Regions:
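A nucleotide-sugar donor-handling region in carbohydrate enzymes
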Residues: 1-27
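Short acidic/polar capping segments at secondary-structure boundaries
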Residues: 25-28, 55-57
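A conserved mid-protein helix/loop that constitutes part of the nucleotide-sugar donor-binding site
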Residues: 27-36
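A donor-sugar binding/catalytic signature common to diverse glycosyltransferases
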Residues: 84-131
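Nucleotide-sugar donor-binding patch of glycosyltransferase catalytic domains
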Residues: 115-156
Length: 201
């Protein structure tokens, strides 16, 4: 869309470039993923990694040690500033892949309809593993997206991370957009409540 392209242009992201947003805790697989991303960027023109401030920025700074100096220029890193929610949403809509954390950002990323990876908040008893798998089941995630989630969330070795490619992103986008459509087709909550009250009265 025009708004999406305008956002990308403002941030120096060209047509045909791949833009990836990163809003995470400390993913166990981050060093492996950054090394993989720099060794084989998904876009032939340019790949941009938009890193949110705070924990994501700190963990990326540490993990970049795993990327050989000769490859560090293969991906353009953008250090983002704190921003209000509407601007965060604009970024989600404008990126080709959104790696998000927490439930609020997951919902926002689903509405954006772009490929997404969810870093679920880790719980000490690993209860989040079942929760993540339940989400992936609902999403009807293809095997590659499920494998990425498992490695990203420490449920599988980092070596099992699938490489990000244009074909993979297309498959993931189709999955997310189908899930978004299912949500849009739901009866609005107020109508569900009205029907419930009518049925009980």
């Amino acid at each position: 869309s025009e708004g999406r392209q305008a956002w990308r242009t403002r941030h120096g992201i060209g047509t045909g470039d791949c833009a990836i947003s990163l809003f995470c805790y400390e993913p166990p697989a981050l060093p492996q993923w950054l090394a993989q991303l720099h060794a084989a960027p998904p876009a032939p023109q340019a790949t941009h990694l938009l890193v949110t401030p705070g924990r994501a920025a700190a963990t990326v700074q540490q993990a970049m040690a795993s990327v050989p100096a000769t490859e560090q220029g293969a991906v353009t890193r953008h250090a983002l500033q704190p921003c209000p929610q509407p601007q965060f949403d604009e970024m989600l809509w404008a990126c080709d892949l959104n790696l998000v954390r927490g439930e609020d950002s997951l919902v926002r990323a689903l509405w954006a309809g772009q490929p997404l990876v969810w870093h679920i908040y880790p719980q000490h008893d690993d209860a989040h593993h079942d929760k993540l798998d339940a989400f992936l089941d609902w999403l009807q995630a293809p095997a590659s997206l499920r494998a990425f989630h498992h490695a990203w969330n420490g449920m599988a070795p980092a070596s099992t991370l699938p490489a990000i490619t244009p074909a993979l992103l297309k498959q993931w986008q189709e999955c997310v957009q189908a899930a978004r459509l299912r949500l849009l087709q739901q009866t609005p909550l107020i109508e569900q409540l009205q029907a419930f009250v009518t049925e009980k009265s």
